[in-house]
Amino acid sequence: MYSSYSLSKRLIYVPILAIQFLLVRSVSSLNLTNEYLNHKCFVSEGKYKHGDKYENNLNVLNKNVLSYDLTSGFLHVSHGEGPDSVTIILQCRGDSFGSNCRSCYTTAIDGFHRRCQRNKGGIIWYDQCFLVISTIKPQLPRKIDFKNTFSMHNPNNVSSEPGSFDKMTRDFLYKLVQKASYPTVVEHQSTYYAAGEKKLGKRKLYAMMQCASDILQCKVCLEWCIRELPKCCDGKQGGRILGMSCNLRYELYPFLRR
């Protein structure tokens, strides 16, 4: 069963389960959830058979990943050569590093195996992380991927002056870009993340944005996301743009760990 929940043309539908996290619930509940959001199987990379070299390389790499502390919330690792090589890219949300990141990775790798059975490549998004698995080793730093993106919005409309709300929201997001695009070094790894809140009359706006640690031009990516918001989220109380390179979200309620 599918909803008409807003998605970009690049990824057309999202299961109705994926919108549950956007419904207003208690802050403690939101902080504990890690909802599945979306996925895409890279069909062009082919499939593997049980026991072949690709599966062995994937298992070796997965075992290695599980041994990392993931303090910086990011991982880009490869194993093997040629068509049987495996690359894993993991980016955890800025408030979900360390053990929370490892937990999200475990959820994501299991979800990938269920939803992209025997596919050699694909991407899967959860609330607290996204995971890319591929036979292709991208040149580093990675270029911005504008193709594999999608949008989601809060089902509730802004009750008054939606145009003014949209403008103030985007003005605030552009200010956050300045902070997010300036790297913070965690465990020798650059992280690009910012979160903030802003008073809007009697209500408060909460927002976050983040770039994958291995991409070029974080600022360009985040500003592109902001320009995409009118296509999905005008007049809505919350919205988000997600992709392989960067993502952002805003709501009228807190949704991050403190």
Curated annotation (Swiss-Prot):
Keywords recorded for this protein, A-Z: Repeat, Secreted, Signal
Compartment annotation: Secreted
Cellular component terms (Gene Ontology): extracellular region
Signal peptide (residue range): 1-29
Domain Gnk2-homologous stretches: 36-138, 146-255
PANTHER family with a match to the protein in the record: CYSTEINE-RICH REPEAT SECRETORY PROTEIN 29-RELATED, CYSTEINE-RICH REPEAT SECRETORY PROTEIN 38-RELATED
Name of the protein: Putative cysteine-rich repeat secretory protein 35
Organism field: Arabidopsis thaliana (Mouse-ear cress)
Originating gene: CRRSP35
